[in-house]
Amino acid sequence: MIYESTRDINRKLNPSEAILQGLSEEGGLFVLRDLGKNKLDLENLIGKSYYEVAEAVLRLFVDFSDEEIKECVEQAYRGKFSHENITPLVELKDGHVLELFNGPTSAFKDVGLSLLPQLTKTALTKVEDKNDILILTATSGDTGKAALEGFKDVDRTKIMVFYPNDGVSTVQKTQMQTQEGKNTKVCAIHGNFDDAQSGIKELFVDEEFKKELLSKNIKLSSANSINIGRLIPQVVYYVVSYLDLVNTNKIKLNDKVNFVVPTGNFGNILAGYYAEQIGLPVNKLICASNNNNVLYDFLTTGVYDKNRDFLKTVSPSMDILISSNLERLLYYVSGCDNDYIAKLMKDLKETGRFEVTGDVLAKIKDKFIAGFADDEQTKETIKAIYEKDNYLLDTHTAVAYKVFLENLDNEHASIVLSTASPYKFTESVYSSLFETQGEDEFTLMNKLHEQTKVVIPENLRDLDKKEIRHKDVINKEDMKKYILEKLGDL
């Protein structure tokens, strides 16, 4: 089992090495060339637990023993999620919602970032690397807190998270600023998420920077979904949700299903593509964007163009113009053509755009449907679904639900991925339903609970009473300097 870079066929690593390195030296992402060679035995997984399905999926992607995989899964999830099924499926009048927000930080990122630290620890022992790992992560709000919580006080790891100072919700910012852990550091930047993500990607290909870290016995890795170890765990809940429909007789085994995914960096929806490649019967993957609809334009025209205004929306975790994981999809639909991918990514870096045509675009359009919702439509959807189903959506899930309603399919069951608790975006959710008088987000959190009786996740209760530990704000150009200065604190 060998991973290679999307941009260079000669850069190859085993799974443990790929998880630890995160990003290839020239900027490519690690992929399995023969993805789909081995398939899941879905029939054998009917009635199995989340843990057992996760183990079956991981066996297709990592070079760990069965015992090591089982230990990773147990350590990641047992007792850490508020629902015994980890990612429960809820039936509404029009379709199903897959709740991915029952983890330690109330966002779907918990699924991947609870398992990644366990994969990292195991990989370190397998490659016998004596260096510590520095996890560098850019966040549009949810990844940061989930990564911090996942790697908090994990031996031989240090983690630094960078977020856009004015580009996350009050709750998301407070979650990160109050983070505990002797190996954690959080810093805001003046800029947007793309600035933070680009800054980190540049450090991964900065040989001088990596040499300086190595002199301190430290190697770089990432907790973003550019790391294959973050992406693989997300494949699991696609399989689990499908099997839930089979187990409850909503579909028969081998019936195809649609998945509707609120999408920013393209990692979550790519996990659905991976699930199909290993045998899951997927009809369409429906990509839902907010007003930063660069992916909608690409999936409908083949032109990817980030040369546009960056818009702040009520769904800030999707406020992204550079969708990193799209590179992995392009690799597969181009027939694993590394040189072609290298050229596309060079065009994107130099001109801010690239275009795909012909067979590549046809393959994408065959599997993907795209739609988007603006802020007004998002808030209208929150209100409509609450009134119709007595169910509370967060802003990102509302974007997906609006796109789902535009693409109703009577021939296939559909699952909408719900990526965050509504309490992470309280002001936007509350004001979709009720009048506000300028209250702060934490006051509105309690009022939303009083009005709807939806339980506030334990990790968000009394969040505003916790000590602020991380107050640093820097210019985006100063990330390298900041990291080297602060390493000694970890």
Segments predicted by a language model, with ranges:
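PLP-dependent amino-acid enzyme catalytic core
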Residues: M1-L490
